[in-house]
C-alpha cells in the first residue's frame, strides 16, 4: 500500500484499534513502523483522545532512549502514525525468549544495562514535568545495530526505546494528577486504590513518583521472571499490594535489593526519584564488586532461602523461597492533521531486494501499541472494564488538562 511518500511493506502487528506495518519512505533506505487506524472505529472515542495526546507529546520528546515520532498522515479512511522502527521488538518478548533459551530470567548485568537506559529516559521525561502512567515491559522496545546481535539476543548490545505515551500527561498546577490510567499490575498503589473504588477516592492524587513504582515492578520482573505482585484478579492484586510484601531470592546482590526497595515503597514520598536512582550503586558500580547476601550471617531464624520485603512497613523478614520454586519462575504474567491524502493498494510489494517476510516475521501482539491496548485481566472473574483500567471520565480528564485543545505544552 502506498500512502503519500510511504510504502507499507508488511503487516508486523495487530492491536485492538489498528495495525502496525513495516514501512519505507521514498528516497530513504531506513525502515519505519507505521500505526494504521481505521477512522470509522476510532474517531469520537476515548482512543482518539489518547492518540492525539500521544502525537502532541511525542513531538516534544527527543531522546536516544525514546522511540522517535516521525510523521502523521490522514486519508479519507485512516490515520497513519509513523515512528522509528526498533528491530528487537518488545522487552517482554525478549524476556520470554531469554527464559526459553537459558531457563532463567535476566542476569543482574543485563538488568543493570537496561535500567541505566530506562532511568536515563525517565530523568528526561520527568524534567519536562511529564508522567508516563503506563510503564510496562510491553511499552519498552529494543534496537540492535547488527542482525547478529538481534538473532543471538545479545541484550548487552541492545538500546532501549520507550514507547506509548497515549496516557502520558503534563503535571497539573497542583503538582498532582487524579485520573485512573495505566495497567493495574504495574500501577501505583494510590491509582490502584482509586481504580478499585471506581473513582470514589477522588481526593487521592499522585505525581511522577507513580512512574517510579512502575519502574520498580518492571525491574523486578526482569530480575525474577514474574510480577512482584502476581495475581489472578483485581481483588487479589489489591490485597497483595496492600499487604505490601514481595519475595526476592537470596541469590541477588544487596545492591539490587536496595535499588528495588528505593522504588517499591508503598508511600510515594519514600521512593527515590530518577536522579537518585541514576546515582544508585546498582547502576554505577561494577557488577563484580556487588555484595552477595550470606544467609549464614543473617540473624534470626532462617526458614528458607528467600527475602520477603514489606513495602508498606518498610521492613524485611526471611521467608521460604526454595530452589524448586525458583526453577518454576516464568513470566506470567489537538494536533493539526494534514488534509486527507490518497491511498493506493499494491498487489506486490518490492523493496530494493530486501526479504521483508524473512527479516520481519509477523508478531502476535503489536509493539508501538498506542491506544491499541488489551485488558490485562481479560476473561478473569471480577476483572475491571477497559474504561476503568484505561480511562477516566471526560470531565475528570478535562480538569487535569488531559483533553488537549491545541497542545498540553502551550
Where are these regions (language model features)?
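Conserved N-lobe ATP-binding subsite of Hanks-type protein kinase domains
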Residues: 19
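A short, aromatic-enriched beta-strand patch in the conserved N-lobe beta-sheet
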Residues: 71-72
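Activation segment signature within eukaryotic-like protein kinase domains
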Residues: 114-115
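Protein kinase catalytic-loop region centered on the HRD/HxD motif
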Residues: 120-130
Amino acid at each position: 500500500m502506498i500512502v503519500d511518500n510511504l510504502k507499507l511493506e508488511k503487516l508486523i502487528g495487530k492491536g485492538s484499534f489498528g495495525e502496525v506495518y513495516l514501512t519505507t519512505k521514498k528516497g530513504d533506505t531506513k525502515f519505519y513502523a507505521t500505526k494504521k487506524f481505521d477512522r470509522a472505529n476510532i474517531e469520537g472515542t476515548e482512543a482518539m483522545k489518547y492518540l492525539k495526546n500521544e502525537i502532541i507529546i511525542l513531538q516534544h520528546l527527543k531522546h536516544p532512549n525514546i522511540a522517535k515520532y516521525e510523521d502523521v498522515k490522514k486519508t479519507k479512511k485512516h490515520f497513519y502514525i509513523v515512528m522509528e522502527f526498533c528491530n528487537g521488538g518488545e522487552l517482554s518478548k525478549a524476556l520470554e525468549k531469554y527464559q526459553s533459551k537459558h531457563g532463567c530470567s535476566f542476569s543482574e548485568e543485563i538488568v543493570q544495562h537496561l535500567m541505566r537506559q530506562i532511568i536515563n529516559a525517565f530523568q528526561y521525561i520527568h524534567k519536562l514535568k511529564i508522567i508516563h502512567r503506563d510503564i510496562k515491559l510491553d511499552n519498552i522496545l529494543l534496537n540492535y545495530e547488527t542482525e547478529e546481535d538481534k538473532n543471538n539476543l545479545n541484550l548487552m548490545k541492545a538500546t532501549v526505546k520507550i514507547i506509548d505515551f497515549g496516557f502520558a500527561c503534563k503535571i497539573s498546577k497542583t503538582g498532582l494528577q487524579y485520573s485512573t490510567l495505566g495497567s493495574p499490575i504495574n500501577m501505583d498503589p494510590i491509582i490502584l486504590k482509586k481504580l478499585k473504588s471506581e473513582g470514589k477516592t477522588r481526593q487521592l492524587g499522585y505525581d511522577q513518583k507513580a512512574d517510579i513504582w512502575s519502574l520498580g515492578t518492571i525491574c523486578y520482573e526482569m530480575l525474577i521472571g514474574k510480577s512482584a505482585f502476581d495475581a489472578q484478579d483485581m481483588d487479589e492484586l489489591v490485597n497483595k499490594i496492600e499487604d505490601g510484601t514481595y519475595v526476592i531470592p537470596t541469590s541477588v546482590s544487596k545492591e539490587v535489593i536496595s535499588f528495588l526497595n528505593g522504588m517499591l515503597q508503598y508511600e510515594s514520598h519514600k521512593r527515590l526519584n530518577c536522579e537518585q536512582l541514576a546515582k544508585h550503586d546498582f547502576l554505577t558500580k561494577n557488577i563484580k564488586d556487588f555484595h552477595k547476601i550470606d544467609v549464614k550471617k543473617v540473624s534470626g531464624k532462617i526458614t528458607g532461602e528467600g527475602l520477603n520485603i514489606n513495602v508498606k512497613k518498610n521492613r524485611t523478614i526471611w521467608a521460604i523461597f526454595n530452589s524448586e520454586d525458583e526453577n518454576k519462575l516464568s513470566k506470567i504474567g489537538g494536533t493539526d492533521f494534514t488534509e486527507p491524502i490518497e491511498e493506493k493498494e499494491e498487489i506486490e510489494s518490492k523493496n530494493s531486494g530486501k526479504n521483508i517476510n524473512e527479516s520481519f516475521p509477523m508478531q502476535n501482539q503489536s509493539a508501538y501499541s498506542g491506544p491499541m491496548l488489551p485488558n490485562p485481566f481479560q476473561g478473569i472473574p471480577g476483572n475491571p472494564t477497559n474504561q476503568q483500567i484505561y480511562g477516566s471520565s471526560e470531565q475528570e480528564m478535562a480538569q487535569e488538562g488531559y483533553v488537549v485543545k491545541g497542545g498540553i505544552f502551550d
